[in-house]
């Protein structure tokens, strides 16, 4: 409290020292009649007189040193510029743009929910070993953790929050640091997030001599940083509520420039966006914003405008909003079931920002304790053979997100993902559509896979094969058409419900021409909607990180021409690389015999021996199976794949035969997969032992039926003609 009094009393000069190196004179500085006077006293006291007569305060430095370290006092003294002339101080801050009496007061939703203190029977310490025994088998997360321990790990690094010459007092705090440089340094952002507030410094470099700069601060109204000179936070306050406040520090010249090019027209909307949503809500809003950046090509070519600035400030504010969970004088126990979903949504948002803006740098917001605790929870989860998960799907995937592959030697994470995908895929193959709930679950699966570091032993196991057989199968021609329609409509989008399995498949044959063909089949779309949808899907599917799925395959080092690859079908022992030219070592088959417009080959690659193989010099013909009988008794084709492709359009859809029901539905007389009315569509059967066939039996039967009908028609016409000739002959004989 004494420290706060000290700062408030000294105001512009913030004099805080046990005994200045030289006693300050009591004579007012030249040209100033009301300068604060510093009266020399004993070495343990400092007397400040504000008007020379009536108002003075005596500060006991001995008592202050009990609460404030000596080096901090000295730093504040040096930062206050006590001995510089008032003219210098005035000139230093005279150009600051002031919003005196213009701060907008808003009413927020009230105090948003934070994780309340709990008293769990099992509390986990991050400073000790964490195992399945430590958590007493509570894989549902019914555990307590220390808010201080988690906060100390997330906000671990200590840094100076503001530049030395900034109008805010320099202060060192535990922070999360974030920076982004764009256009070769023409645009620079540096953000610091603490548990009390967040600051964002924005720099626009026009030339070597012309630079514009602004500092935005948002946070707890009572804990905002102090200011130097004659400036107060009331001079630079834009928006405030009972609990929080938004400040903008910039010069008049820079304010004029940024108001035209960068600053939002309505700062109240920015304030409300951050303050009126919980961590989870704000994180999901920002996730959708990042997807919008990606679909519009704004990740590769950033538009440095008000929308971008608002989004970036809100992303930084997520750190601060998470930090409020850990601010308390006394250590308290919080529920893991409450805090983990918040951490998950926030971290997913941060990951998406990093993937969008690849030059983004962040330091901090990592918790080894959460990672180890999540691994212990995963290890305790019971998995029954051929059964689904024993815990809620979202909880499993949120927990798995924080588990490194090195902490999951039994591959329970990948096993669980296959169970989830098996369930979704079973519903999908009925009519080749996905529900919004299924898409959200796939989004969670995607995040768990993206952040997971695979052990080398997991790269060729059956779970990886199953995962990508499922996801690639769900990336069908119908799915591509759905995505084009979804993004073509100017409606409210959602990162969770707009997710497509194509974003985590092993299919890479996307071109603007192909997407236009798929989208053109939807007669409901206008030309503008078609163009918007195709552009969005193409941007999302061809992002820089779109080929990340190949990283988990054991044959990745053996693919020597990735740009040729159209699709990969992974099985446990072999993989099929479908490409426009030979792209991997193995046995290669030519698909050109089926009159495909563009060349396409299929290479059968051994997962374990591809390092020792060379590219095939001989390209074989694909064997053909005529009149293939429908499998009836058992699942003869389980763990095989059927692929359809068009002579003009190329690959269309892949179907993984996961069980007997899928097999029977696929080959039934009512199957919607086989198009009996299109003579230009062909089908390949790829088996898990490296054997492949082209299925032509359906076409042979269909062609024979047509020929028979034609023969009967010709015979009937010939009979009619003969009868006609006989009648005419008898009539005129």
From Swiss-Prot:
Example GO CC term: the record gives: membrane
The protein's location, in the record's own words, is: Virion membrane; Host cell membrane; Host endosome membrane
Highest taxon in the source lineage: Viruses
Q: Which residues cross the membrane?
A: 708-728
PTM note says:
N-glycosylated, O-glycosylated, and sialylated.
Annotated region Interaction with gL: the residues are: 185-249
Classify the main location.
virion
Stretches in topological domain Intravirion? 729-733
**Disulphide linkage map:** none
Glycan attachment sites? 78, 119, 266, 431, 561, 573, 612, 627, 689
Which GO BP terms sit in this record? fusion of virus membrane with host plasma membrane; symbiont entry into host cell
Which regions of this chain are Virion surface-facing, per the record's topological domains? 15-707
Sorted alphabetically, which keywords does the UniProt record give?
Answer: Fusion of virus membrane with host cell membrane, Fusion of virus membrane with host membrane, Glycoprotein, Host cell membrane, Host endosome, Host membrane, Membrane, Sialic acid, Signal, Transmembrane, Transmembrane helix, Viral envelope protein, Viral penetration into host cytoplasm, Virion, Virus entry into host cell
> Which residues are the signal sequence here?
1-14
The record gives the membrane topology as: Single-pass type I membrane protein
What does this gene product do? The heterodimer glycoprotein H-glycoprotein L is required for the fusion of viral and plasma membranes leading to virus entry into the host cell. Following initial binding to host receptor, membrane fusion is mediated by the fusion machinery composed of gB and the heterodimer gH/gL. May also be involved in the fusion between the virion envelope and the outer nuclear membrane during virion morphogenesis.
Question: Record's family?
Answer: Belongs to the herpesviridae glycoprotein H family.
Summarize subunit and interaction data from the UniProt record for this chain.
Interacts with glycoprotein L (gL); this interaction is necessary for the correct processing and cell surface expression of gH. The heterodimer gH/gL seems to interact with gB trimers during fusion.
Q: What is this protein called?
A: Envelope glycoprotein H
- Originating species: Alcelaphine herpesvirus 1 (strain C500) (AlHV-1)
Lineage from the top down? Viruses, Duplodnaviria, Heunggongvirae, Peploviricota, Herviviricetes
Report the gene name: gH
């Amino acid at each position: 409290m004494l420290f706060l009094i000290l700062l408030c009393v000294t105001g512009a000069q913030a004099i805080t020292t046990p005994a200045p190196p030289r006693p300050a004179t009591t004579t007012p500085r030249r040209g100033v009649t009301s300068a604060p006077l510093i009266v020399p006293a004993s070495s343990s006291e400092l007397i400040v007189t504000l008007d020379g007569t009536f108002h003075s305060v005596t500060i006991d430095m001995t008592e202050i040193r009990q609460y404030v370290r000596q080096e901090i006092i000295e730093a504040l003294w040096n930062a206050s510029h006590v001995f510089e002339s008032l003219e210098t101080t005035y000139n230093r801050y005279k150009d600051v743009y002031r919003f005196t009496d213009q701060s907008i007061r808003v009413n927020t939703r009230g105090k948003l929910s934070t994780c309340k203190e709990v008293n769990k029977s099992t509390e986990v310490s991050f400073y000790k070993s964490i195992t399945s025994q430590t958590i007493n088998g509570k894989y549902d997360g019914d555990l307590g953790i220390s808010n201080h321990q988690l906060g100390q790990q997330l906000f671990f690094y200590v840094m100076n929050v503001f530049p030395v010459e900034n109008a805010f007092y320099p202060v060192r705090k535990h922070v999360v640091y974030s920076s982004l440089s764009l256009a070769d340094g023409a645009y620079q952002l540096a953000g610091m997030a603490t548990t009390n507030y967040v600051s964002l410094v924005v720099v626009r470099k026009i030339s070597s001599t012309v630079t514009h700069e602004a500092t935005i601060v948002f946070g707890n109204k009572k804990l905002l940083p102090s200011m130097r000179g004659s400036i107060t936070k009331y001079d630079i306050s834009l928006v405030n509520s009972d609990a929080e406040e938004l400040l903008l520090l910039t010069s008049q010249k820079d304010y004029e420039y940024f108001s035209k090019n960068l600053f939002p027209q309505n700062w109240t909307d920015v304030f409300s966006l951050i303050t009126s949503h919980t961590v989870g809500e704000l994180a999901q809003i920002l996730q959708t914003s990042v997807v919008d950046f990606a679909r519009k090509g704004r990740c590769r070519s950033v538009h440095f405008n008000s929308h971008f600035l608002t989004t970036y400030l809100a992303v930084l504010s997520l750190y601060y909003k998470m930090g409020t969970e850990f601010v308390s004088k006394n250590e308290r126990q919080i529920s893991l079931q409450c805090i983990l979903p918040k951490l998950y949504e926030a971290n997913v948002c941060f990951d998406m920002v990093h993937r969008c803006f690849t030059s983004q740098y962040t330091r901090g917001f990592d918790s080894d304790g959460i990672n180890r605790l999540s691994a212990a929870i995963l290890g305790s989860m019971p998995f029954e053979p051929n059964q689904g998960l024993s815990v809620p799907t979202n909880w499993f995937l949120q927990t798995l997100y924080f588990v490194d592959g090195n902490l999951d030697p039994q591959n329970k994470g990948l096993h669980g993902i296959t169970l989830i995908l098996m369930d979704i895929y079973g519903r999908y193959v009925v009519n080749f559509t996905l529900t919004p709930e299924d898409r959200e679950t796939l989004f969670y699966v995607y995040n768990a896979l993206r952040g997971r570091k695979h052990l080398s032993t997991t790269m060729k196991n059956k779970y990886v094969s199953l995962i990508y057989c499922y996801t690639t199968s769900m990336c069908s021609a119908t799915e591509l058409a759905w995505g084009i329609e979804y993004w073509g409509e100017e409606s409210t989008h959602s990162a969770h419900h707009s997710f497509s399995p194509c974003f985590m498949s092993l299919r890479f044959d996307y071109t603007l021409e192909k997407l236009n063909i798929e989208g053109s089949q939807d007669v409901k779309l206008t030309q503008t909607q078609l163009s918007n949808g195709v552009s969005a899907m193409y941007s999302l599917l061809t992002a820089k990180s779109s080929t990340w799925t190949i990283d988990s395959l054991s044959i990745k080092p053996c693919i020597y021409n990735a740009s040729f690859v159209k699709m990969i079908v992974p099985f446990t022992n072999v993989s099929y690389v479908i490409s426009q030219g030979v792209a991997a070592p193995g046995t290669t088959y030519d698909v050109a015999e089926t009159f495909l417009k563009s060349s396409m080959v299929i290479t059968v690659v051994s997962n374990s021996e591809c390092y020792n193989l060379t590219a095939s010099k001989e390209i074989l013909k694909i064997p053909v199976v005529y009149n293939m009988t429908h499998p009836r008794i058992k699942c003869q084709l389980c763990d095989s794949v059927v692929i359809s492709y068009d002579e003009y359009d190329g690959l269309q859809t892949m179907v993984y035969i996961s069980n007997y029901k899928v097999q029977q539905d696929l080959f039934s007389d009512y199957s919607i997969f086989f198009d009996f009315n299109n003579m230009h569509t062909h089908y390949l059967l790829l088996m898990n032992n490296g054997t492949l066939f082209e299925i032509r039996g359906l076409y042979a039967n269909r062609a024979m039926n047509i020929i028979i009908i034609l023969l009967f028609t010709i015979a009937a016409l010939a009979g009619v003609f003969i009868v006609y000739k006989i009648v005419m002959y008898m009539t005129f004989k």
